[in-house]
Structure formats: structure tokens, C-alpha cells
């Protein structure tokens, strides 16, 4: 059984209902809608196809709406791409202009105020580097240091410069409203710098009338200075290694990845590792050895999920990429499970203490499953962060929780009707474990629940249960 989950970015390469089904069959657990590209009608169609395919497959698939964020970009060129040579003078302006090889506009009107001579500007994830020569009015005049091609809407990074952009652009606000109304399970906020960025998201959510979990994308050096506060304020994090590797020395990224994963696990928040996981599979049917090792190391670091971007959205081998990643994860877990480091912190809350005790008791009694009943998913996430070798099944009456737990490491979610007593919960567990073939009569499971049922965050009970006792009426309370 594979524990770490797979996030797939939707796009033209997997547009049909048949392709979505193949993604799920290959191992997709979450579908990402990247709102940097495409319109609402296009994304709604993709979301609907994922929901339909998930229902047909009988599997939980989470939907992540990824906001573009205040990404600084070049504007559009009259034609192109244009090849910039070393030493060329290239001007980036806030004026509305039709781009040429020598001068182009930008989406960020504050660029001249944030730049000074000597600053380096990286274009298209660092493929092209220019150095600021002078700032004249609305123009930032630069000299090409690292040559390469420039084209429409390529991203701009300013390493070491604290740009004065808001957490949410006007586009992001509209995209957030759309994503919530469309039925997203998670929102991803780009270029998070501090914990306060989440407040802007919650203002919009409160206007809509409800909240859903928000994942902070860690891709700016400023975020690393506030990482613990960000993890505490958000509902999960994504290690977005693309911009992160452009904004800071590349040799720092592996250690940042490990730190992000460790802090998220300690807080029982899901953590996704993203960018260039199997990048060569956009055009090749098999990955490089380095990519396979990268995926394996993310698993051994303890990540909840690994994300595919262009590999599935525009790649020529989208299904193969998912299947390959699933095999790498499964084999890594099979042969290297003990290398996943145990948490170095002790639980600080009742729910954490009970789930940790359940995992320890489960190991002692040889439990077939760790079972949790959950409204919000909190107890399942607390169980998941322990990275126990015993599989976890989470029963919930909430469809939203069922879908969201598809992202959490090792959790197999199931939807069950709401009941009023813990004995009824145990009977539900008995029935579903036996009917699904997960466990057989006479095997032990450890059950974690809240009593009385139905109160989020009320985990306060643990019991060792012998499968079959409830449906067989062995104990008087079950008769």
C-alpha cells in the first residue's frame, strides 16, 4: 500500500474524461487547478470531470485551486520569442507598450520603486538574468548577464528585494471567490511572506460565507524567516521549489525542504513537495535517475504528497508520470520505511496524545488498522503525522472532510452516516472493515474517537477492538 499521496496538475494533456479516469487509476489523489492559466469555464469543466471520475471510481480526490498570486511578469510582446544576447540593453517599463526585443512592459507597477542599480532581475525562473543599470522614471534599464529567450508573460524574480506587493491581487480575489463557489477543497496561496497573509484570504472567505483550508506556498526567502508562524496560521504548506530555488542559493533548497516538512508534521498539517519532480517526463517516457532519487528523498523526508506540474498538465507522458511516481513512492516506502524520521516533539494537545498512544498500542497488539472517526479530519491528520507503519482508515460523515483527507499521508477516508453513540461507531467500523476486506474477524484494530460523537476536535477515547465482536454481538452493548 502506498502512503504518500500524488498531486496532479490538470491541463490540456489530460483534458478528456478518459484521461482523468486514467490519472486516478494510475494513482492521483489530488487534482490541482492552476489559475495562472485558463479561464473559469475551462477550470470548472476540469473540476467537474474530476468529481465525476472520482465518484465512478469510488475514491476520494481532493481539488486544489492554486491562486496565481502577485507574480511579477513581463507583459506581452508584438512577436517573439526574442533571443537576448550577453551585453544587450533590455528595458522593462511600467508604460503600456507593445513589447520588442529592446523594451517590454511589466504587470508590476512598483518595479521602478523597488529596483536600484546593481540589482539582478531573473526572468523565466532564472533562465535569463539581467542587471539593473539605471532607473529612469517608469523605465528599469538593464544589461543582459545570462542570455536566453524572453516571451509573453514570463515571470520575474528579484532575489533579495522585498517587493511591496499585496498578498492577494484583484485577480486572486476573484479567483478565490470562484474557487470556493466551484467547490474547491483547498486553496493554495502563492508567495506567502508571513502569517498575516492568511487574514486577507479569510476576509474574502467570510464574505462568501464559509471557510476552506488554505495552503501556504513557500517560495520566498521572507517566508523562511517566518516559517513557524506561517505553519501555525495556515492549514498546510507547499514547498514550491521553483521560485524558491531562483530567489535563494540553490544549495539551500534541500535543507529548506526538510525543515518545512518537519515543521508541518509537528503541527499535523499536510505538506506537499512540488516542482520538477519528474520534469524530464514532460517529453520522455522515463525519468532521470536523479529525479527518481529526488522523489524517494521527499518520501523519506516525510512529505504527505508529491506534486506533478507540467508532467501532467502539458506532458506527452502524463499517465506514465503518475504511474512512475506511484511506483517510486511504493518501493521507497517498502524498503526504507524505517528511514522516515520519528517526530522529535511530544504532543501538546489531548487529541495528539490519544492518537500517539493509539499508534503505540497498535504496534504492541499487532493492529491491522488504526481507525479514527472524525468530523474535521483533525484526529486523522494527527494520526498521519506519526508515520506509523499501520495503515489508517478515517470514517467521517462529512463529504468535504472525506475529500480533504485524500491529501494526508497514509489515510484511507470513508464516508459513514452520523451516529449518536461510540458503540454505533464501532459497529460501523466492524461492518465496513469486513465488507471492504481490510480486516477479518478476530483481528485487532485500534479505534480513536470523540465521545459524544459529532463535536469537531473532541477526540478523547481509544479502544482496542476485535473485528467481528460488534457485528457478531459478542459484547452485550453491541446486541
Please place each PLM-identified region on the residue numbering.
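Non-catalytic helical/linker scaffolds that mediate oligomerization, partner binding
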Residues: 1-479
Amino acid at each position: 500500500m502506498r502512503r504518500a499521496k500524488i498531486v496532479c496538475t490538470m491541463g490540456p494533456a489530460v483534458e478528456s474524461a478518459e484521461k482523468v479516469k486514467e490519472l486516478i487509476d494510475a494513482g492521483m489523489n489530488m487534482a490541482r487547478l492552476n489559475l495562472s492559466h485558463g479561464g473559469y469555464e475551462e477550470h470548472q469543466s476540469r473540476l467537474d470531470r474530476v468529481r465525476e471520475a472520482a465518484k465512478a471510481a469510488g475514491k476520494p480526490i481532493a481539488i486544489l485551486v492554486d491562486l496565481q498570486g502577485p507574480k511579477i511578469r513581463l507583459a506581452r510582446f508584438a512577436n517573439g520569442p526574442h533571443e537576448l544576447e550577453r551585453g544587450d540593453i533590455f528595458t522593462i517599463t511600467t508604460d503600456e507598450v507593445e513589447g520588442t526585443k529592446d523594451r517590454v512592459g511589466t504587470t508590476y507597477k512598483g518595479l521602478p520603486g523597488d529596483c536600484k542599480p546593481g540589482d539582478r532581475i531573473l526572468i523565466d525562473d532564472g533562465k535569463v538574468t539581467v542587471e539593473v543599470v539605471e532607473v529612469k522614471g517608469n523605465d528599469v534599464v538593464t544589461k543582459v548577464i545570462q542570455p536566453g529567450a524572453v516571451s509573453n508573460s514570463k515571470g520575474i524574480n528579484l532575489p533579495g528585494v522585498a517587493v511591496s506587493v499585496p498578498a492577494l491581487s484583484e485577480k486572486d480575489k476573484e479567483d478565490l471567490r470562484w474557487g470556493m463557489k466551484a467547490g474547491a477543497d483547498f486553496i493554495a496561496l502563492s508567495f506567502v511572506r508571513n502569517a498575516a497573509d492568511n487574514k486577507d484570504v479569510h476576509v474574502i472567505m467570510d464574505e462568501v460565507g464559509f471557510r476552506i483550508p488554505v495552503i501556504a506556498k513557500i517560495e520566498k526567502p521572507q517566508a523562511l524567516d517566518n516559517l513557524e508562524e506561517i505553519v501555525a496560521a495556515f492549514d498546510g504548506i507547499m514547498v514550491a521549489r521553483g521560485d524558491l530555488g531562483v530567489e535563494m542559493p540553490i544549495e539551500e533548497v534541500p535543507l529548506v525542504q526538510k525543515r518545512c516538512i518537519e515543521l508541518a508534521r509537528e503541527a499535523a498539517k499536510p505538506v506537499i513537495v512540488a516542482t520538477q519532480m519528474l520534469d524530464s517526463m514532460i517529453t520522455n517516457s522515463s525519468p532521470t535517475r536523479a529525479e527518481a532519487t529526488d522523489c524517494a528523498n521527499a518520501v523519506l523526508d516525510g512529505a504527505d504528497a508529491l506534486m506533478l506540474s507540467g508532467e501532467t498538465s502539458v506532458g506527452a507522458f502524463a499517465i506514465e508520470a503518475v504511474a512512475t511516481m506511484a511506483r517510486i513512492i511504493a518501493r521507497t516506502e517498502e524498503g526504507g520505511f524505517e528511514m522516515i524520521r520519528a517526530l522529535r516533539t511530544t504532543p501538546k494537545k489531548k487529541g495528539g496524545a490519544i492518537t500517539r498512544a493509539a499508534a503505540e498500542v497498535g504496534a504492541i497488539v499487532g493492529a491491522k488498522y488504526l481507525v479514527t472517526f472524525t468530523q474535521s479530519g483533525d484526529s486523522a491528520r494527527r494520526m498521519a503525522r506519526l508515520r506509523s507503519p499501520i495503515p489508517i482508515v478515517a470514517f467521517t460523515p462529512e463529504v468535504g472532510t472525506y475529500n480533504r483527507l485524500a491529501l494526508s499521508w497514509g489515510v484511507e477516508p470513508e464516508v459513514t452516516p452520523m451516529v449518536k453513540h461510540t458503540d454505533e461507531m464501532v459497529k460501523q467500523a466492524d461492518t465496513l472493515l469486513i465488507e471492504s476486506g481490510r480486516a477479518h474477524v478476530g483481528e485487532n484494530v485500534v479505534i480513536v474517537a470523540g465521545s459524544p460523537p459529532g463535536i469537531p476536535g473532541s477526540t478523547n477515547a481509544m479502544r482496542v477492538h476485535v473485528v467481528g465482536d460488534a457485528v457478531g454481538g459478542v459484547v452485550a452493548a453491541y446486541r
